[in-house]
């Protein structure tokens, strides 16, 4: 299955279908979920990054349980916007997840999402131990919210 750009993905979605945001790290995958109006992202949880088939099964279970119709996967572009090794690995994983789950997938720039989330948690005086368990899902939520904001921007009339 091919990857969609965000706008094309939105035009294929059924009404009131949620989106799942995934922030794939080297060890943990952060998970976030949109509301049915696709306006608000919330942290959902995290899972260990293991075998592809297991990750795909977990993602499909969440999609069925929560009424999600597509995935938005974080793309860790380099600071200059280029595709480095981490972004290429995320793209390869996104293609594999799309193929395994059969769900449509779009990718979203996630530069500095973990840093922004860490900074917010530090400002909220969350201890380092508690931050460790929350950053992945919060980073997925931060990235998904960025995608939702783009999808909800008014478009100029053609």
UniProtKB/Swiss-Prot annotation:
Keywords: Cytoplasm, Hydrolase, Nuclease, Ribosome biogenesis. It is an enzyme of class 3 (hydrolase). InterPro entries: RNaseH-like_sf, YqgF, YqgF/RNaseH-like_dom, YqgF/RNaseH-like_dom_sf. Gene3D superfamilies: YqgF/RNase H-like domain. GO terms for cellular component: cytosol. Its EC number is 3.1.-.-. SMART domains: YqgFc. It is found in: Cytoplasm. GO terms for biological process: rRNA 5'-end processing. GO terms for molecular function: nuclease activity. It holds the Pfam family RuvX. Belongs to the YqgF nuclease family. Could be a nuclease involved in processing of the 5'-end of pre-16S rRNA. This is Putative pre-16S rRNA nuclease. It comes from Acidiphilium cryptum (strain JF-5).
